[in-house]
């Protein structure tokens, strides 16, 4: 017998992987898609010139693209992953990776404090938040930011009906961009269901629209889904 109650997740196309749950099912409805930029010669030349001592990777997609195109041009830098999923992708290519205790941008910053006199490279999306960048600039730390993929909005004709269905217990939004899209789609409708967020920036974006956020997790999609599942048994 299937599970009728469900949570909506909004992982981008290509990033969602089905996972086992006990008490609710998962319906993933992407609101964005990832566009990879491929090998960029200007990035390669900049890496060779600047020789980063530390590399920050904030997504599994970014990690995959980094190792596919750019890692060979570095000189064995330390690598920091924002969360477990990103770290798992990195470990396909090398064993040593640092993961912050608090798996978000502020946790990454805590690890970067030992690289004050180093060159740091950020490999990420063109839509990433500026929390890490702002801290690096404020502390006059030499860093380079490389955009190796982008995230664009896609039209969803089903998310509104799925969210308003009585079997839906709520939604898990994984980025501030998804939060903005969700607000545009549901604007003017009173929300009484649970809204969950991944990351402080997503949480802050939702609250800026007047939504109550039931729970905010760090950069670990599977862990927060398991938490939501356990709370609905």
Model-derived features with residue positions:
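Signature of uroporphyrinogen-III synthase
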Residues: 1-233
């Amino acid at each position: 017998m299937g599970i009728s109650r469900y949570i909506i997740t909004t992982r981008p196309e290509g990033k969602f992987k089905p996972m086992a749950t006990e008490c609710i099912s998962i319906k993933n409805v992407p609101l964005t898609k990832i566009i990879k930029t491929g090998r960029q010669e200007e990035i390669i030349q900049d890496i060779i010139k600047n020789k980063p001592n530390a590399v920050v990777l904030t997504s599994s997609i970014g990690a995959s693209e980094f190792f596919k195109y750019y890692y060979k041009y570095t000189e064995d830098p330390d690598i920091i992953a924002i969360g477990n999923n990103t770290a798992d992708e990195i470990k396909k290519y090398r064993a040593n990776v640092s993961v912050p205790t608090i798996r978000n941008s502020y946790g990454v910053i805590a690890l970067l404090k030992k690289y004050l006199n180093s060159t740091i490279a950020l490999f990420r999306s063109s839509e990433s938040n500026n929390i890490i960048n702002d801290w690096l600039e404020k502390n006059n730390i030499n860093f380079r930011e490389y955009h190796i993929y982008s995230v664009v909005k896609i039209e969803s004709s089903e998310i509104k009906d799925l969210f308003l269905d009585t079997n839906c217990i709520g939604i898990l939004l994984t980025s501030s961009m998804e939060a903005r899209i969700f607000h545009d789609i549901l604007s003017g409708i009173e929300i009484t269901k649970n809204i969950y967020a991944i990351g402080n920036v997503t949480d802050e974006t939702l609250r800026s629209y007047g939504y109550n956020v039931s729970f905010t997790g760090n950069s670990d999609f599977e862990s927060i889904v398991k938490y939501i599942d356990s709370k609905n048994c």
